[in-house]
Amino acid sequence: MRIDTSALCDIYSDQVDVVEPIFSSFGGASSFYGKITTVKCFESNGLIASVLEEEGQGRVLLIDGGGAVRRALIDAELAQLALDNGWEGIIVYGAVRQLDVLETLDIGIHALAPIPVGADDNEIGEVDTPVNFGGVTFFPEDYVYADLTGIILSPELLDLAELEE
């Protein structure tokens, strides 16, 4: 289903938080939504790879990379792993790389910027902890909705049937 964050903001203005417009879309899917799983790490993506090995149906991986853009936390291999395991999308408060491949994959990917340098593969960081960036606090189990216009957050699953009316 196509997500329209503008319409969702109009319908659920009292229920959603809007993430500051600091992200760009790099994946092949223009919109996505799901229940958040958070990873907090810095310039290392080993923990990200471990989480992406899990079943991702109905889930979005939200990565707090501290806003660092010196090393890419998501590359083509990790994006393909996410797609293979059914993840709906990935949001990276950090950088990504291999854009020519990312844009061909049917998964939503939002990040701050691209850079060709890869991350370390250490499994250092935290999983399912609250993270704060873009003017909002993301809690594990919250729901995130993203499209080319922006990213919004809700503590509850929104009724997307409202978009069709």
UniProtKB/Swiss-Prot annotation:
Per its UniProt entry, which superkingdom is the organism in? Answer: Bacteria
Q: What is its main location?
A: cytoplasm
What S-S linkages are listed for this chain?
A: none
GO molecular function annotations of the record: endoribonuclease inhibitor activity; enzyme binding
Per UniProt, subcellular location reads as: Cytoplasm
Which UniProt key words apply to this protein? Cytoplasm
Q: Where does it sit, as one GO cellular component term?
A: cytoplasm
What SUPFAM superfamilies does its record include? RraA-like
Q: CDD domains under this entry?
A: RraA_family
* UniProt record, GO biological process: regulation of RNA metabolic process
Quaternary data: Homotrimer. Binds to both RNA-binding sites in the C-terminal region of Rne and to RhlB.
Cited function: Globally modulates RNA abundance by binding to RNase E (Rne) and regulating its endonucleolytic activity. Can modulate Rne action in a substrate-dependent manner by altering the composition of the degradosome. Modulates RNA-binding and helicase activities of the degradosome.
Tell me its family: Belongs to the RraA family.
Q: Name the chain's protein.
A: Regulator of ribonuclease activity A
Which species is the source of this protein? Actinobacillus pleuropneumoniae serotype 5b (strain L20)
